[in-house]
From Swiss-Prot:
<protein>
    <recommendedName>
        <fullName>Small ribosomal subunit protein bS20</fullName>
    </recommendedName>
</protein>
<dbReference type="GO" id="GO:0070181">
    <property type="term" value="F:small ribosomal subunit rRNA binding"/>
</dbReference>
<feature type="region of interest" description="Disordered">
    <location>
        <begin position="1"/>
        <end position="25"/>
    </location>
</feature>
<dbReference type="GO" id="GO:0005829">
    <property type="term" value="C:cytosol"/>
</dbReference>
<feature type="compositionally biased region" description="Basic and acidic residues">
    <location>
        <begin position="1"/>
        <end position="18"/>
    </location>
</feature>
<dbReference type="Pfam" id="PF01649">
    <property type="entry name" value="Ribosomal_S20p"/>
</dbReference>
<comment type="similarity">
    <text>Belongs to the bacterial ribosomal protein bS20 family.</text>
</comment>
<dbReference type="GO" id="GO:0003735">
    <property type="term" value="F:structural constituent of ribosome"/>
</dbReference>
<dbReference type="InterPro" id="IPR036510">
    <property type="entry name" value="Ribosomal_bS20_sf"/>
</dbReference>
<keyword id="KW-0694">RNA-binding</keyword>
<dbReference type="GO" id="GO:0006412">
    <property type="term" value="P:translation"/>
</dbReference>
<keyword id="KW-0699">rRNA-binding</keyword>
<dbReference type="GO" id="GO:0015935">
    <property type="term" value="C:small ribosomal subunit"/>
</dbReference>
<keyword id="KW-0689">Ribosomal protein</keyword>
<comment type="function">
    <text>Binds directly to 16S ribosomal RNA.</text>
</comment>
<dbReference type="InterPro" id="IPR002583">
    <property type="entry name" value="Ribosomal_bS20"/>
</dbReference>
<keyword id="KW-0687">Ribonucleoprotein</keyword>
Length: 91
């Protein structure tokens, strides 16, 4: 446990930030899973495209703001794009 007042404050701040970061990452995972579920369910292309765009938009935002590493964001975007393009061709 922190011994100084400033250390207590830093602990409170880091807990809040940690919770915020976890929420953002969880939201991203949910968006990606929703897109994958739509593809598995053979949903309409417009629905899948909407899910794809929202996931890519979230990846961009989190990558730029360093919530996830920029290279990881780029890699995930590439994976989602390949998944979407494969679905669009099969559709």
């Amino acid at each position: 446990m922190p011994l100084h007042k400033s250390a207590e404050k830093r602990l409170r701040q880091s807990e809040r930030r940690n919770a915020r970061n976890r929420a953002r990452k969880k939201e991203l995972k949910t968006l990606i899973k929703n897109m994958q579920k739509l593809i598995e369910a053979r949903a309409a292309k417009s629905e899948v495209e909407s899910a794809y765009r929202s996931a890519v938009q979230k990846l961009d935002r989190l990558g730029v703001k360093s919530y996830i590493h920029a290279n990881k964001a780029s890699r995930k975007k590439s994976q989602l794009t390949r998944l979407f393009n494969g679905y669009a061709e099969a559709e």
